[in-house]
């Protein structure tokens, strides 16, 4: 049985520690010389997140942090412990069933260079470019040097998807997969996790890959970005990956540290969205949508139908389930969402209604997407949704249909971005097909 080591971590008890060195022992919430409170777990600088009350039991005031309560309470009374990081060399061997494309090899070499030079890098990669496989050589290089490696994403769904592929490829590595409900199994030298799990690591990781960096909640939460820094060693490399970087994100990198990857690994262009006017009415069955879905079934295509509102989706579901017995809906608040997605992969649901929970990380062959009320979606979401199609070698094309009640700038920008990436891929010689 493997002994779990808690290196470079914040722990609440020494009970399970063995040979780890404790570098901090004290309250979880402390006050600096200027009277400002600081949380050892999340580090929030916002003083309104700290609440002070008088404890009758201990007969003294106690201040606790409200910002990270869901990860366990930090206060000015109970002691916590931070352990020193440790390193362990491994072979980092991995297996791929195919050879990297020219573009993937190009990105892979830049990742290794960034790790060697302890620099940050942004991979601006088209959806389906094969980002996961681009990471492998960098992971191997880091582990052979004894570096601690983390791969993080803001979304649980993406973490689960990536972890399956990486564990399958790195069979000789002890990999911890951490998200809500999943705890550490090994020594934390190679971790795949949601970003929130990094709150528990301190000065530990030499290399962190951040997938879908633009996704909620990371893009909207500077505190989570600070968490990446706190979880990193004094010298580190952060590899950011996204298909839809914001202008704010792009400005954070030097031009030479932005690697644009406009082509998919199979050298075929990303399907370009089609626009169709359709005034959606969730409270009744609409003949156009019914016939469209029937045609999808006849063509033996799997169809994701995206909605921007859960309520509207569930109202529509009640009407269309009468015609499609295997039709289900999935959203972030759905307790059965993981089971439904697995059933979708198994071919049990040829049509599924979904919110943007499936806009990222989900891949399968013979997949088309339809967006209901596309005028209400942001550009980044539309690009991500379009990127669900044509990802597999046996099925490189697909339908991307934006049903709208009036064309918006976001729709136009999404279509333009996709066409520009396809054109750039041609110019670089990384695409075979003409547009």
Q: Which residues fall in each region the model found?
A:
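Interdomain "pre-motor" coupling segment immediately N-terminal to P-loop NTPase/helicase cores
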Residues: 28-87
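N-terminal pre-P-loop "Q-motif" helix
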Residues: 96-119
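Conserved interdomain linker/interface between the two RecA-like ATPase lobes of SF2 helicase motors
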Residues: 121, 256-318, 325-327, 429-431
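Conserved strand-helix element at the start of the C-terminal RecA-like helicase core
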Residues: 124-132, 142, 147-162, 286, ...
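Conserved helicase ATPase core of P-loop NTP-dependent helicases/translocases
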Residues: 160, 173-187, 328-355
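Post-DEXD/H (motif II) to motif III coupling segment of the RecA-like Helicase ATP-binding lobe
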Residues: 203-277, 284-291
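Conserved RecA-like helicase motor core of SF1/SF2 enzymes
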Residues: 212-215, 341, 345-397, 404-409
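Conserved segment of the helicase C-terminal RecA-like domain
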Residues: 233-248, 388-417
């Amino acid at each position: 049985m493997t002994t779990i080591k808690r290196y470079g971590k914040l722990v609440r008890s020494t009970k399970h520690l063995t040979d780890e060195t404790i570098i901090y022992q004290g309250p979880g919430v402390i006050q600096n010389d200027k009277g400002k409170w600081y949380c050892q777990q999340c580090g929030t600088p916002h003083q309104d997140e700290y609440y002070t009350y008088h404890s009758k039991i201990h007969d003294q005031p106690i201040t606790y942090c409200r910002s990270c309560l869901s990860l366990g309470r930090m206060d000015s009374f109970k002691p916590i412990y931070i352990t020193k990081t440790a390193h362990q060399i491994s072979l980092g061997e991995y297996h791929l069933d195919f050879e990297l494309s020219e573009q993937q090899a190009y990105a892979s070499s830049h990742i290794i260079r960034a790790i060697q030079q302890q620099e940050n890098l942004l991979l601006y990669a088209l959806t389906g470019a094969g980002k996961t496989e681009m990471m492998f050589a960098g992971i191997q290089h880091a582990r052979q040097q004894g570096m601690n490696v983390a791969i993080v994403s803001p979304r649980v769904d993406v973490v689960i998807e990536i972890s399956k592929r990486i564990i399958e490829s790195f069979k000789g590595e002890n990999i911890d997969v951490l998200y809500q409900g999943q705890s550490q199994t090994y020594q934390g030298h190679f971790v795949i996790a949601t970003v929130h799990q990094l709150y528990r690591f301190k000065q530990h990781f030499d290399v962190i890959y951040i997938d879908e960096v633009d996704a909620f909640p990371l893009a909207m939460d500077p505190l989570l970005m600070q968490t990446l820094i706190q979880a990193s060693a004094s010298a580190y490399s952060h590899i950011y990956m996204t298909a839809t970087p914001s202008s704010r994100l792009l400005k954070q990198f030097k031009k030479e540290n932005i690697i644009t990857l406009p082509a998919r690994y199979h050298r075929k262009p990303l399907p370009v969205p089609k626009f169709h006017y359709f005034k959606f009415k969730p409270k009744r069955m609409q003949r156009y949508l019914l016939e469209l879905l029937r045609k999808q079934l006849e063509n033996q295509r799997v169809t994701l139908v995206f909605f921007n509102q859960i309520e509207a989706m569930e109202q529509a579901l009640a009407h269309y389930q009468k015609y499609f017995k295997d039709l289900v809906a999935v959203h972030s608040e759905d307790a059965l969402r993981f089971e439904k997605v697995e059933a979708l992969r198994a071919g049990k649901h040829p049509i599924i209604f979904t919110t943007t929970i499936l806009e990222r990380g989900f891949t399968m062959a013979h997949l088309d997407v339809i967006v209901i009320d596309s005028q209400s979606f942001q550009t980044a979401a539309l690009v991500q949704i379009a990127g669900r199609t044509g990802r597999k070698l046996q099925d490189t094309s697909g339908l991307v249909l934006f049903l709208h009640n009036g064309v918006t700038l976001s729709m136009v920008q999404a279509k333009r971005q996709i066409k520009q990436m396809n054109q750039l891929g041609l110019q670089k010689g990384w695409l075979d097909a003409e547009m």
